């Protein structure tokens, strides 16, 4: 482990950074950065300030604090960002015996967390559309795209069954990509098109706009989805000073969770702009108090 950095895959961005780890700790906090699926300036180091704030607390030593990188667009498109997150989790289960986990994600990091809660459906639809779009465009095959095999998917499900999801903290997230483009137009459509193969694919990429995920059903994370419904602590944070994302995405997410009859805790505060909110001490304290 070089400076707390370990590889969970072959790509240079398939990396985890262990800010704090003790194998005797029972609970792990995993942090997932944003950056519109494409910005190399957003990395696991985004969370240095949050980690520092958390470590001031006298009880912080009992938590493992880990952040992750994942492959970016346009090198890869959805759902490979989600697959990377899953591979990172699988790596932690298999190599560090981590089972109880809380996750906090910023911006598209929060998107990835939402996708995780229905990951099999999101992967199935995402890869299906990606393969169809790629064939139509470049006559590429499923093998060329390195779509995970059936065996890889089975092994992934086995690893995910061993995880107990405790708390998800969504920080200034994107939850409905179709509505995001409707609100902001061309500038946002540009980075979305970098990350997705077609409008159909990004419409199916999250539960809020998907035609295949039933809004009335519990999250289908795994066979223990009822436990996810009953035990997962959902926390939604939004800075009212965010210049890149208005309250609309957060309000849409709150409406969606309400339709699902799921409990959640919303927090809104003056925590600065989009790239400052996750650095704010108040946000760090909410995350720590929630896990």
UniProtKB/Swiss-Prot annotation:
Q: Which InterPro entries match?
A: AB_hydrolase_fold, BD-FAE-like_dom, GDXG_lipolytic_enzyme, KFase_ver/fungi-typ
Matching entries from SUPFAM superfamilies are given as: alpha/beta-Hydrolases
Keywords (alphabetical) are: Hydrolase, Tryptophan catabolism
Q: Active-site positions, per UniProt?
A: 107 (nucleophile), 242, 280
Q: Which GO terms describe its molecular function?
A: arylformamidase activity
Task: Look up keyword Membrane and say if it applies.
Answer: no
Top-level division of the source organism's lineage: Eukaryota
Which residue ranges does the UniProt annotation give for the motif HGGXW? 33-37
Could you mention a single GO BP entry for this protein?
L-tryptophan catabolic process to kynurenine
Catalytic activity from the UniProt record: N-formyl-L-kynurenine + H2O = L-kynurenine + formate + H(+)
Q: What is its EC number?
A: 3.5.1.9
Lipoprotein: present as a keyword of the record?
A: no
The pathway it acts in is: Amino-acid degradation; L-tryptophan degradation via kynurenine pathway; L-kynurenine from L-tryptophan: step 2/2
Coiled coil ranges (UniProt) are none
Q: What does this protein do?
A: Catalyzes the hydrolysis of N-formyl-L-kynurenine to L-kynurenine, the second step in the kynurenine pathway of tryptophan degradation. Kynurenine may be further oxidized to nicotinic acid, NAD(H) and NADP(H). Required for elimination of toxic metabolites.
UniProt family annotation: Belongs to the kynurenine formamidase family.
About its domains, the entry says: The main chain amide nitrogen atoms of the second glycine and its adjacent residue in the HGGXW motif define the oxyanion hole, and stabilize the oxyanion that forms during the nucleophilic attack by the catalytic serine during substrate cleavage.
Subunit structure, interactors included? Homodimer.
Any idea what this protein is called? Kynurenine formamidase
Organism of derivation: Debaryomyces hansenii (strain ATCC 36239 / CBS 767 / BCRC 21394 / JCM 1990 / NBRC 0083 / IGC 2968) (Yeast)
């Amino acid at each position: 482990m070089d400076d707390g950095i370990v590889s969970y895959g072959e790509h240079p961005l398939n990396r985890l950074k262990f800010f704090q780890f003790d194998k005797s700790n029972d609970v792990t906090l995993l942090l997932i950065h944003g950056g519109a699926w494409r910005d190399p300036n957003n990395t696991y180091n985004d969370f240095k300030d949050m980690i520092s704030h958390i470590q001031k607390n006298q009880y912080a030593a009992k938590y493992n604090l880990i952040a992750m990188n994942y492959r970016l667009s346009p090198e890869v498109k959805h759902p490979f960002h989600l697959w990377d997150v899953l591979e990172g989790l699988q790596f932690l289960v298999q190599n560090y015996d981590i089972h109880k986990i809380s996750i906090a994600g910023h911006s598209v990091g929060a998107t990835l967390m939402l996708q995780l809660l229905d990951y099999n459906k999101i992967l199935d639809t995402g890869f299906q559309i990606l393969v169809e779009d790629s064939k139509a465009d470049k006559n590429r095959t499923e093998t060329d795209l390195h779509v995970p095999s059936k065996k890889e998917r089975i092994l992934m499900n086995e690893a995910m069954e061993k995880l107990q999801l405790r708390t998800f903290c969504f920080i200034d997230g994107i939850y409905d990509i179709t509505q995001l483009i409707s609100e902001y137009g061309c500038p946002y459509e540009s980075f979305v098109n970098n990350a997705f193969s077609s409008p159909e694919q990004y419409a199916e990429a999250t539960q809020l706009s998907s035609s295949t995920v039933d809004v009335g059903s519990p999250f289908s994370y795994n066979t223990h989805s009822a436990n996810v419904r009953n035990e997962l602590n959902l926390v939604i944070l939004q800075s009212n000073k965010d210049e890149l994302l208005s309250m609309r995405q957060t309000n849409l997410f709150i409406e969606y969770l309400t339709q699902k009859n799921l409990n959640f805790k919303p927090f809104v505060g003056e925590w600065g702009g989009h790239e400052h909110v996750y650095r704010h001490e108040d946000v760090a304290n909410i995350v720590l108090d929630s896990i």
